[in-house]
A protein has these predicted regions:
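PLP-dependent class I/II
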Residues: 1-168
Length: 168
């Protein structure tokens, strides 16, 4: 068993680049050898910040988890009301895969929608930034984030619904 984790999502410390690995000794040695050639050490301030997060109270984590869970539920319920779309409920992180394949073959502003790249480009024209699912090996989806305010989520989903209505 190999376990890899970090502080990015749990402690909202994206960009700090602090992570760890637990593995059998021979596997850990091989990974250490590779890692030492691939990256350098994280800054000491990042290491101390991670240590403080790991040793600190979990009260803020619980609040943050509840806020993200509320946003996730809100987003899923709102997506389910948009005809022609679906979503894959996430098990972790703060992303939802929006299923958009029913839009394929249809047109938006005279252009044919062939895949998730097209949907992402067209949604950007509507002021909504998404990541094409093809980047994750699933061209039937685009990825949405709920690491933003509930108000911004609602506004983005309103724009997505408007886009879908224009397509259908």
């Amino acid at each position: 068993t190999v376990i890899v984790n970090g502080v990015s999502k749990t402690y909202a410390m994206t960009g700090w680049r602090i992570g760890w690995l637990a593995a059998p000794k021979e596997v850990a040695k091989a990974i250490d050898s590779f890692q030492s050639h691939a990256t350098s050490n994280p800054a000491s301030v990042s290491q101390y910040a991670a240590l403080a997060a790991l040793n600190g109270s979990e009260d803020e984590l619980i609040k943050m988890r509840d806020i993200f869970n509320d946003r996730r539920k809100f987003m899923i319920e709102r997506i389910r009301r948009i005809e022609g779309l679906g979503c894959i409920e996430p098990d972790g992180a703060f992303y939802i895969m929006l299923v958009v394949d029913k839009l394929y073959g249809k047109r938006f502003n005279g252009r044919k929608i062939n895949g998730s790249l097209d949907v992402a480009d067209m949604l950007l024209e509507k002021g909504v930034a998404v990541v094409p699912g093809i980047a994750f090996g699933d061209d039937e989806c685009v990825r949405l984030s709920y690491a933003i305010s509930k108000e911004d989520i609602a506004a983005g989903l309103d724009r997505i619904e408007e886009f879908v209505k224009e397509v259908f």
